Amino acid sequence: VLNEPSVVAMNSFNSKIISVGKDAKKILGRTPGNIIAKKPLKDGVVADFNSTEKIISYLLRKTLGKSLIRPEVLICVPSQITQVQRRAVIQAAKYAGAYNTYLIEEPLAAAIGSGIDVTDARGNIVVDIGGGTTDVAVISMGGIVINKSIPVAGDEFDKRIQDFVQTKYNMIIGESTAEKVKINVGSAYPRDDGELYEIKGRNLVNGLPMHIYVSSKDISV
């Protein structure tokens, strides 16, 4: 399974793509002036067409190698995106080399991936927290009965962690560091395990390296 974040790093002078995926994410939030690391998907939809195309093209090349066969592609999208946004995703995949592109709503894909029998008449509630959107849906008989998509998800959690660390400790951390904090000690409810997680960053006042320790009580919703 190929697992790559939707991040690109490019030269700010000529817009040339330097790296994609994990390599680009490593420098997200801490790039020198001539390199820009960005996420071309905003709230689960295409915000930068060219960069989105580059990401899809990169993933296809990494998966298929130098194959001359144009693949069929299935892409997950938020459940409430517009027809215009759907067409933008399909066009980006087409320009990247896909022969046919099919879209599936993220809650339905999450249910299938979790082993839920989506064809069952009994309804199942699925909450899919992605990077840009959180989708909540009731799934029954192979489809979505009712759903709601909100533009608050993992990316916003990371931003809130960055803001918290900067406000409380006068320390600046990058998006990748904030995500690691979220994964390791983030919790909807404070845990009582007493686990502490070390965060390394840069002092906001003097610019020197520093570190702090936080617990799930600090990072809980």
Q: What function would you assign to each model-found segment?
A:
Residues V1-I129, A137-V221:
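Nucleotide/phosphate-binding catalytic cleft detector across ATP-hydrolyzing
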Residues G132:
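Conserved Rossmann-like nucleotide-cofactor binding loop
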